[in-house]
Amino acid sequence: MAGRSGDSDEDLLKTVRLIKFLYQSNPPPSNEGTRQARRNRRRRWRERQRQIRTISERILSTYLGRPAEPVPLQLPPLERLTLDCNEDCGTSGTQGVGNPEILVESPTVLESGTKE
């Protein structure tokens, strides 16, 4: 399935069925009763949904050996990022790709808004 190496299709299907069963075991609350009773039922339902989501993530990481979501990309602080066009930038859209330059002392880009 979907080109996953190392994962058998049966394990993936079994995991998906288990997670589907968890979500089906918590149907949305009914619309009967007073406003306060409905609000309490929705609050408890949302809490159960959060617990099911947490359990599902743990099941995915345990059975499939990987997290449910990709690891976020670590970026340097915004203060250190600059656009440096001292060299001939050219008109090509791909020039300089793959070689990002990070200057430690960045020039002031935004000033007070007054021209000198």
UniProtKB/Swiss-Prot annotation:
Keyword Iron-sulfur among UniProt keywords: no
Keywords: AIDS, Host cytoplasm, Host nucleus, Host-virus interaction, Methylation, mRNA transport, Phosphoprotein, RNA-binding, Transport
Region (Disordered) residue spans: 23-48, 92-116
One GO BP annotation of this record: mRNA transport
Localization per Swiss-Prot or TrEMBL: Host nucleus, Host nucleolus; Host cytoplasm
Residues spanned by motif Nuclear localization signal and RNA-binding (RRE): 34-50
Comp. bias (Basic residues): 36-47
Coiled coil: none
Post-translational modifications: Asymmetrically arginine dimethylated at one site by host PRMT6. Methylation impairs the RNA-binding activity and export of viral RNA from the nucleus to the cytoplasm. Phosphorylated by protein kinase CK2. Presence of, and maybe binding to the N-terminus of the regulatory beta subunit of CK2 is necessary for CK2-mediated Rev's phosphorylation.
Segments carrying motif Nuclear export signal and binding to XPO1: 73-84
Region (Homomultimerization): 18-26
Subunit structure: Homomultimer; when bound to the RRE. Multimeric assembly is essential for activity and may involve XPO1. Binds to human KPNB1, XPO1, TNPO1, RANBP5 and IPO7. Interacts with the viral Integrase. Interacts with human KHDRBS1. Interacts with human NAP1; this interaction decreases Rev multimerization and stimulates its activity. Interacts with human DEAD-box helicases DDX3 and DDX24; these interactions may serve for viral RNA export to the cytoplasm and packaging, respectively.
HAMAP family referenced in this protein's UniProt entry, alphabetically: REV_HIV1
Function: Escorts unspliced or incompletely spliced viral pre-mRNAs (late transcripts) out of the nucleus of infected cells. These pre-mRNAs carry a recognition sequence called Rev responsive element (RRE) located in the env gene, that is not present in fully spliced viral mRNAs (early transcripts). This function is essential since most viral proteins are translated from unspliced or partially spliced pre-mRNAs which cannot exit the nucleus by the pathway used by fully processed cellular mRNAs. Rev itself is translated from a fully spliced mRNA that readily exits the nucleus.
Comment on protein domains: The RNA-binding motif binds to the RRE, a 240 bp stem-and-loop structure present in incompletely spliced viral pre-mRNAs. This region also contains the NLS which mediates nuclear localization via KPNB1 binding and, when the N-terminal sequence is present, nucleolar targeting. These overlapping functions prevent Rev bound to RRE from undesirable return to the nucleus. When Rev binds the RRE, the NLS becomes masked while the NES remains accessible. The leucine-rich NES mediates binding to human XPO1.
General remark: HIV-1 lineages are divided in three main groups, M (for Major), O (for Outlier), and N (for New, or Non-M, Non-O). The vast majority of strains found worldwide belong to the group M. Group O seems to be endemic to and largely confined to Cameroon and neighboring countries in West Central Africa, where these viruses represent a small minority of HIV-1 strains. The group N is represented by a limited number of isolates from Cameroonian persons. The group M is further subdivided in 9 clades or subtypes (A to D, F to H, J and K).
Protein name: Protein Rev
Species of provenance: Human immunodeficiency virus type 1 group M subtype B (isolate JRCSF)
Taxonomic classification: Viruses, Riboviria, Pararnavirae, Artverviricota, Revtraviricetes
Gene that encodes it: rev
